[in-house]
């Protein structure tokens, strides 16, 4: 079985990073995450990230370097998570709350204290090590 691709984007504002809390309900309801989602069939990871950010946050981004990659399983399906740094097109805009009920800009050292979606721990661990 081939692995599906999931993408996440890490945006900075000063020294802080954007995290968003999923709406209540479902397996990840109420947990914090880096905005992103699953790539559609035939969609490249960077294209998927741009689309997902627009759908979830209403924000337009430029996708930068890959910063983390890891594997996890969701309902028995192997998924490859690829995280990229992203730059917001408008640095003074806040995200819309479409699939989330809250957002915050956090210092990377605070990531370990948040109730993050399990798959995003891969990304948080890389960010925490780099900011130590």
List the predicted regions and their residue ranges:
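Generic C-terminal helix-cap and adjacent flexible tail
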Residues: 128-132
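Conserved beta-strand residues within beta-sheet cores
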Residues: 6-8, 60-63
């Amino acid at each position: 079985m081939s692995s599906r691709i999931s993408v996440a984007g890490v945006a900075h504002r000063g020294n802080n990073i954007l995290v968003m809390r999923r709406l209540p309900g479902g397996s990840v309801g109420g947990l914090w995450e880096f905005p992103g989602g699953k790539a559609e069939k035939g969609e490249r990871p960077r294209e998927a990230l741009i689309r997902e950010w627009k759908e979830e946050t209403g924000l337009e981004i430029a996708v930068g370097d890959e910063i983390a990659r890891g594997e996890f399983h969701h309902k028995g399906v192997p998924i490859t998570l690829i995280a990229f740094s992203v730059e917001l097109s408008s640095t003074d805009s806040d995200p819309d709350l479409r699939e989330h009920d809250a957002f915050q800009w956090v210092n990377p050292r605070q990531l370990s204290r948040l109730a993050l979606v399990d798959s995003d721990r891969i990304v948080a661990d890389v960010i925490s090590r780099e900011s130590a």
